[in-house]
From Swiss-Prot:
InterPro entries hit by this protein: DUF5517
Name of the protein: Uncharacterized protein A-100
Task of the protein: This protein may be involved in virus assembly.
Amino acid sequence: MVSPQTRKEEELLEKQNSVFYLLTLGRKPYGSYLHIKIELDEDEKLEKEIYADNIKLENELRQLKRLYEVYQSVEIDDAQKAIQKEALLTIAKILSVFDF
């Protein structure tokens, strides 16, 4: 039996189809920075920037790119849902750097 809390979490996952995010890695004279902008809808936007040396997100970004490519080629709903969950976990790893 599925608990109400689990059901609610599943529903929230379903509604996250239209989240857009932009991740920028840059360099300034005093160090590296990572900027993220997330648009949940037209009215709700989150932006955050952190400054740090040696920001290591290359693996996560490569994994997101691979997941996106695989998602486009898969036509089976169950496989697409599994890829979506993996992509959300990878995005969560990236967001953990920002302390959201």
